[in-house]
Amino acid sequence: MQSLFEWDFNERKENLEEILKNHIQEFGKEAQGEEFVYELAYGVRDNLAAIDEIIIKHATEWPMDQIPPVDRNVLRLGIFELMFLKQVPPKVAINEAVELGKTFGGESTGKFINGVIGTLYKELEPADIAGVENSEAKDPEQLSTEKT
């Protein structure tokens, strides 16, 4: 989260890899999960346009440039986990984002994050959510035959 914040705060002009290396060296020398940190950061970076479009669609009261940088990057992480990471269950992704928001954001950040990502989650089809296997999703034909 801190690496994405710094990268975004500096208008994405700095090298994300260098920021990550510095933060891991400074804050996470003994931390496990370094690969996961890189997966999250690069995943957000590589899908930034799509993720930001989702934020714009679901945070209609807030233009992107008016969303505080902490909130914006917590949303990006949460949406990336929800939409792209199969190993993270959807409700875990939402909860982690809300808790990050409460920890690093302002007084109402947790509620804001929960509102945006929670609304997105409710709108998604099961096959659209990374933590739900496609085999769990039901197609419309299957639903219509189950009703009869």
Annotate each language-model stretch with its function:
Residues 1-104, 108-148:
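N-terminal interaction/assembly modules
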